[in-house]
């Protein structure tokens, strides 16, 4: 199989689809890998590293897309749509429930698109999303602490406080991978941390994990309002695989927050959980202020720590990439049900229910679309 690794063009996206070691594994399995010039430079992998791993370095963006399978990090941008072709396997993060134009382009060009974030194991865990959820969660507490500083628009609060001064209050909505990792860092900074989740069993697990050092609260509209308005930092970390994020925090709740408080919307790439995160921001211009509250809505948070993120992502995605390359997508889907759940579009059909519902499109199951 011929595989392409393009350079990411999203604002300040410095990750790359595969590390040199990942490329080497594919080449050793008999595949041809084309890597776009400087694709790995943001993660401090040089072209020579990829060449030594067996890749062919190509300068033309069109050439790296003229392959059997493209492995990326983030969803293609509009300038990349012309490279779509029937039968192309696209393996990347897609978050299509918030990307109607991209979804339509994939359907129109009959692309076989496999989204990292919807590959799901029998225990409902998301193996290709988890590493980036860990990174984004940990970053969210660090970023929140940074933007609480007065010089960054915040109210000038130190999350850990000092003796005789209250700690900063951090509320995390969602107790999954991202929320749990946000809590780890916020606790490490010395903050007063509350996690809200809809699953009582998960709250019990979190209470055990943190030894009672975090407040665990059932998530419902009344509790969300109560804790949001008294918080210095609110982190949104709710995920419904493949579907748009629910708008759990209303504009009225935001209006009740203190001036200079901060919200971090980790779920912004799926539409966000705050009614007031009505636009996606970038690492170049990460925040805006609305109702006196600092809003951080960067959709590719892990892109700011690309070396760590690329290596973590490569560890998770490579076994699936090898499976797709070695077996072909049909046999790979037949033999690995979790991977088949990653299929979002197939030759003109939407094969993810959450995406189909988001845009009122016709849904076909993977088995029906592929006649498995």
From Swiss-Prot:
<dbReference type="InterPro" id="IPR007886">
    <property type="entry name" value="AlaDH/PNT_N"/>
</dbReference>
<dbReference type="Pfam" id="PF05222">
    <property type="entry name" value="AlaDh_PNT_N"/>
</dbReference>
<dbReference type="GO" id="GO:0000286">
    <property type="term" value="F:alanine dehydrogenase activity"/>
</dbReference>
<keyword id="KW-0560">Oxidoreductase</keyword>
<dbReference type="InterPro" id="IPR036291">
    <property type="entry name" value="NAD(P)-bd_dom_sf"/>
</dbReference>
<dbReference type="Pfam" id="PF01262">
    <property type="entry name" value="AlaDh_PNT_C"/>
</dbReference>
<dbReference type="GO" id="GO:0005886">
    <property type="term" value="C:plasma membrane"/>
</dbReference>
<comment type="similarity">
    <text>Belongs to the AlaDH/PNT family.</text>
</comment>
<dbReference type="InterPro" id="IPR007698">
    <property type="entry name" value="AlaDH/PNT_NAD(H)-bd"/>
</dbReference>
<dbReference type="InterPro" id="IPR008142">
    <property type="entry name" value="AlaDH/PNT_CS1"/>
</dbReference>
<dbReference type="InterPro" id="IPR008143">
    <property type="entry name" value="Ala_DH/PNT_CS2"/>
</dbReference>
<comment type="pathway">
    <text>Amino-acid degradation; L-alanine degradation via dehydrogenase pathway; NH(3) and pyruvate from L-alanine: step 1/1.</text>
</comment>
<dbReference type="GO" id="GO:0042853">
    <property type="term" value="P:L-alanine catabolic process"/>
</dbReference>
<comment type="function">
    <text>May play a role in cell wall synthesis as L-alanine is an important constituent of the peptidoglycan layer.</text>
</comment>
<feature type="active site">
    <location>
        <position position="95"/>
    </location>
</feature>
<keyword id="KW-0520">NAD</keyword>
<feature type="binding site">
    <location>
        <begin position="169"/>
        <end position="199"/>
    </location>
    <ligand>
        <name>NAD(+)</name>
    </ligand>
</feature>
<protein>
    <recommendedName>
        <fullName>Alanine dehydrogenase 2</fullName>
        <ecNumber>1.4.1.1</ecNumber>
    </recommendedName>
</protein>
<dbReference type="InterPro" id="IPR008141">
    <property type="entry name" value="Ala_DH"/>
</dbReference>
């Amino acid at each position: 199989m011929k595989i392409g690794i393009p350079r990411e063009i999203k604002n300040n996206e410095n990750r790359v689809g595969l590390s040199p070691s990942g490329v080497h594994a594919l080449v050793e399995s008999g595949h041809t890998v084309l890597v776009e010039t400087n694709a790995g430079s943001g993660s401090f992998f040089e072209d020579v590293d990829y060449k030594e791993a067996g890749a062919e370095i190509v300068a033309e963006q069109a050439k790296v897309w003229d392959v059997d399978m493209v492995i990326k990090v983030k969803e293609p941008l509009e300038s990349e749509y012309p490279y779509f072709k029937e039968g192309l396997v696209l393996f990347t993060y897609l978050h299509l429930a918030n990307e109607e134009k991209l979804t339509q382009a994939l359907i129109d060009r009959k692309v076989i698109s496999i989204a990292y974030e919807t590959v799901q194991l029998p225990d409902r865990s998301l193996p290709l999303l988890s590493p980036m959820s860990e990174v984004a969660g940990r970053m969210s507490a660090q970023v929140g602490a940074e933007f609480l500083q007065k010089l960054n628009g915040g109210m000038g609060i130190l999350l850990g406080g000092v003796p005789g001064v209250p700690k900063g209050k951090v509320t995390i909505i969602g107790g999954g991978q991202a929320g749990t990792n946000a809590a780890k860092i916020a606790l490490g900074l010395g903050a007063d941390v509350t996690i809200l989740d809809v699953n009582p069993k998960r709250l019990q697990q979190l209470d055990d994990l943190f030894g009672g050092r975090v407040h665990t609260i059932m998530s419902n509209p009344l509790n969300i309002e109560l804790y949001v308005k008294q918080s210095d930092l609110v982190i949104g970390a709710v995920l419904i695989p493949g579907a748009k994020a629910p708008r759990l925090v209303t504009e009225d709740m935001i209006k009740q927050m203190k001036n200079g408080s901060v919200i971090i919307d980790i779920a912004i790439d799926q539409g966000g959980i705050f009614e007031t995160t009505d636009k996606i921001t970038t690492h170049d211009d990460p925040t805006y202020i609305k109702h006196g509250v600092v809003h951080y809505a960067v959709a590719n948070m892990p892109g700011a720590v690309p070396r760590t993120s690329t290596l973590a992502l490569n560890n998770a995605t490579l076994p699936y990439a090898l499976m797709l390359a070695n077996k072909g997508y049909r046999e790979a889907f037949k033999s690995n049900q979790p991977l088949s759940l990653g299929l979002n579009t197939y030759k003109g059909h939407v094969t993810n229910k959450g995406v189909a519902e988001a845009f009122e499109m016709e849904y076909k199951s993977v088995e029906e679309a592929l006649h498995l």
